Amino acid sequence: MSSIETLQSVVARAVLTTEPTDVLPLLARGRFDPARRLNIYRNNTLVSLTATLKAVFPVTVRLLDERYFCYVAGCFIRNNPPQEPRLSRYGKDFAAFLARFEGTAHLPFVCETARLEWKIAEALDAPLKRPCTLMELYDGLSSGSFALFLQPSLRLVLCRWPALSIWAAHQQGGDADRLAGLNREPERIALWRHGEAVRFLRLDAAEFAFWHMLIRGQGLEAAVSRACRHSPEFDIARALTGLFVSELVIGIHRIKECSNQEERVS
């Protein structure tokens, strides 16, 4: 490691710790004490990253109370510094941290809500692709098996607690008071970017399995087979139409049975 890289590493470590004694001898003395200058930089870094987390996890802030959230965020930041320059992608591991953190591990509904909020942030950061139409499906695929490619913003979230209900209750017009008798109730959630907002859909077990297989790039036949394991009455026509109406299909590929290859149709 070069000398400049070593210095950067030492300074970065000092910014995230409370006792940066190893870096102080490396700082030039000026008008202000080096320790004081470093404290200013440390505080600015902590405030900036905490503000980023508050913007990504607004409902989690309300669930924990803002002051306690800032304390938890500080603990997270010191152990999980940003790994890339785009702060919009900071916080990926925050929900998992909450599940392990002593002060929040006993609040699984908070951890699940934070996990949902991160998926929302991911969806909003994803690009929008031109959707295909049902007519393209009918025109290009009169026979044979095929696979569907879906919007890159689409996320599936399986929560042990009703995270979407909690999130919705804290939006404008929501009723957070009705969460007083909150019980553990799993939710299967699909969410995707729609313009500058996010759309949500609650799925049953069969629908979740169907969407999950399609996201993995499996063919429609395999997706239907998996869905029917959960519900023999699975309505393929309704499920397929819903994907197109929601503008989630961006590519249709015919699967060549003999070579197991895919041919792009649209």
Q: Where would I find each of the regions flagged by the language model?
A:
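N-terminal, charged low-complexity regulatory/assembly segments
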Residues: 1-129
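Short loop/turn hinge sites at secondary-structure boundaries
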Residues: 17-18, 173, 217
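A broad, structure-centric signal for solvent-exposed, well-ordered loop/edge residues
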Residues: 18, 22, 71, 163-166, ...
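A short alpha-helix capping/helix-coil boundary motif
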Residues: 36-38, 189, 217-220
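Hydrophobic packing positions characteristic
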Residues: 79-206, 265
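C-terminal structured interaction module
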Residues: 196-266
